[in-house]
Amino acid sequence: ETLAAKRCAFIVDHQQYHGKIKELQGAYLPYDNEEKILVCTPENDFNAGRERTGMGVLIARALQQNLLKDREKAEQSLREYHAFYLRELVNAATGLVCNCSGKDNSYFRLYNYPWAVTFFLECWKLWGEKENLKTAVRITEKFYEQDGFRFYPIEMPIVMLCQELEKAGEQEDLKTVRDLFRRHADQLIEIGTAYPASEVNYEQSIVQPAAEVILQVYEVTGEEKYLRGAEQQIAVLELFDGQQPDYHLHETAIRHWDGYWFGKRRVFGDTFPHYWSAENGRTFKRYARLTGNEEYNIRGEHSLRGVLSMFFEDGTATCAYLYPYSVNGQKADFADPYANDQDWGLCMNLE
């Protein structure tokens, strides 16, 4: 909680754009911890959309949990980001989520949809404004209109959306999204372990979404076939984790090249930790809660805590830790200077 509070304060004070470019007004952007400046380019992994949504989700969750000292300042910042999101990234009427500010969707990417759903859900939970809940539903519907049934989305908030629609008395929307989620889980069960390639050919964050989607649908429906389907995926997911006595590695899913794509140094190599590793922890803890298997609860907690080393005492953060001593003859073993997309790691710890 202390790390989250300091991180949120840093984002509000240092990572929100208030300059002359109208298109970026209110955006949360990557930050260069060496030069102490904001970073934004049209390049996918450094733009004002996509994974950077995690900063908005983090601040919304921290506000709900009363973690922030200057609540008024943080809430005003989030309002500005919310306005940016609606103005530059999302068509709230249709549910379209764009890849970059300026409503630029020249690069089509389904991964952006569940993050937008999560952001608007957290805003609904914080402010109680029904339009945010409705927007989350429209984005979900748009995701599935674009063949989302065969996609492996990271952070699709199935249970949360169903719960919030139930609380709000939106029974028609609840039935609609439940049917969509069920079809998605059925499709992933049918595919089984014959995983299709995504942005990379095969990785932990293809297997984990399969397990998580199916397991969440089990939580929503109680149908045993979804538990069995999720267990098939979890058996594969476990293969990405080790139990080495090193905080970089223990229950940290193997990932590689994330520092190259999202970092300043652009170095290839294994990233231990990388924040998406903690997605395994989310799935393990959900499985433990639904089955009573305490071993998975412990493993899940270790996985979630494993990414906290990416956040520092002064509120700064790193997008990845390059674990090898050297990569292609270049010295590694360092935390990349860019704070970029890592805040999902804290979001998971506040969930």
Which residues are covered by each model-predicted region?
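An acidic-aromatic substrate-binding cleft motif
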Residues: 1-86
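Extended, well-ordered alpha-helical scaffold segments
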Residues: 3-11, 69-88, 127-146, 169-192, ...
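Acidic, Ser/Thr- and Gly/Pro-rich intrinsically disordered linkers and low-complexity segments
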Residues: 34-39, 94-104, 197, 249-267, ...
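Short, charged/polar micro-motifs that form catalytic or ligand-binding hotspots
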Residues: 38-49, 102-110, 200, 270
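Well-ordered alpha-helical scaffold segments within catalytic/enzyme domains
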Residues: 51-71, 115-129, 145, 155-174, ...
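Helix-terminus loop motifs that line ligand-binding clefts
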Residues: 69-108, 242-251
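Aromatic-lined, polymer-binding surfaces characteristic
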Residues: 90-180, 184-191, 195-215
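Terminal, non-catalytic domain-edge segments
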Residues: 183, 187, 210-351
